[in-house]
Design a protein with these regions (language model features):
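SAM-dependent transferase fold signal centered on methyltransferase-like domains
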Residues: 1-143
Length: 143
């Protein structure tokens, strides 16, 4: 989920973004992001992954949203990404990463990989109608 955010990293690109640090902007975006994340979690099967990213520096839009999810969904856990460990957020012990402009990795942003604990259920069998679908007919029309 690349959630809409206050876009504080736009400033590092030289793009004006008035009000991006205002509490109303960061708080409103954090609330909207939580709604998006909660909806995304409903689509996540056990054993599935959700990558959460923003292009902002605001903790309420980043680490605090992750902690919000973990508190309400004990079946979730953060996943350590070894390649990102140099960018581990100092604001939480969870596996959250902040890439800042001074790291040389662009204008900055935040990311966290979430995992829903459990085994993936087996895929249901395909319906007979799908198995009987005439793929060969479509292939002959393409050639």
């Amino acid at each position: 989920a690349d959630a809409p955010c206050s876009g504080q990293s736009l400033l590092a690109k030289g793009i004006p973004n008035p009000g991006c640090f205002h509490a109303a902007a960061t708080g409103g975006n954090a609330k909207r992001q939580r709604g998006i994340l909660l909806a995304a979690l409903q689509c996540l099967v056990p054993g599935g992954f959700l990558l959460y990213t923003t292009c902002t520096y605001a903790p309420e839009e980043n680490e605090r949203n992750v902690l919000y999810l973990l508190k309400r969904h004990p079946e979730l856990e953060t996943v350590s990404v070894p390649e990102l460990e140099p960018f581990h957020s100092g604001l939480t012990e969870e596996a959250c990463y902040r890439l800042m402009p001074f790291h040389g990795a662009g204008a900055g942003g935040f990311t966290c990989l979430l995992h829903k604990k459990g085994e993936k259920p087996p895929l249901p069998p395909l319906a007979d109608e799908l198995l009987a679908w005439p793929i060969h007919t479509m292939n002959s029309q393409v050639s």
